[in-house]
């Protein structure tokens, strides 16, 4: 999560850890966005030469300075609580906030369709996608309207499976 308010910018993990100092490029980008205050949902990523996120790299401190913020939802904007707004409304506001060249922050692309994009993401080597039902409201945690679909061939997914099964 990235929060900007009168106190400044903070990057907070889903477990409440403050990673602001770890990702200076993302902090600088969030500082430059055209709003007084906001809370956006996103993830710090490091990309490879093809522009794909490589989640193993983010675990290494030496890559923290290279990390960018992948923004995928907007929760608050200039005092307006958007959690009860449908995903389409939040995405439109997020696009307006993040559009333009902002090194250090990228907008997660939004696709509408029947799921074919999952197969494309898998072929590209992506870890997976999150499918959000049109009209869904913002909820923290898991939801029946938001599904994380993992690519079983992705290295990060295989590593998670090995850790879960103790291999």
Segment roles from a protein language model:
Residues 1-167:
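Catalytic cores of nucleic-acid ligases and guanylyltransferases
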């Amino acid at each position: 999560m990235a929060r900007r308010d009168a106190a400044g910018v903070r990057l907070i993990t889903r477990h409440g850890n403050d990673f602001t100092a770890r990702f200076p490029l993302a902090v600088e980008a969030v500082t430059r966005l055209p709003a007084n205050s906001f809370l956006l949902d996103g993830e710090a990523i490091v990309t490879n030469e093809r522009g794909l996120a490589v989640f193993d790299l983010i675990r290494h401190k030496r890559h923290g300075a290279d990390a960018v913020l992948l923004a995928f939802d907007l929760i608050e904007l200039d005092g307006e609580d958007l959690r009860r707004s449908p995903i389409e409304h939040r995405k439109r506001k997020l696009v307006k906030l993040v559009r333009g060249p902002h090194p250090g922050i990228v907008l997660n692309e939004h696709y509408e369709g029947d799921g074919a994009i999952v197969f494309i993401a898998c072929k590209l080597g992506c870890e997976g996608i999150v499918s959000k039902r049109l009209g869904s409201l913002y909820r923290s945690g898991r939801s029946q309207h938001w599904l994380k679909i993992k690519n079983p061939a992705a290295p990060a997914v295989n590593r998670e499976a090995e850790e879960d099964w103790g291999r």
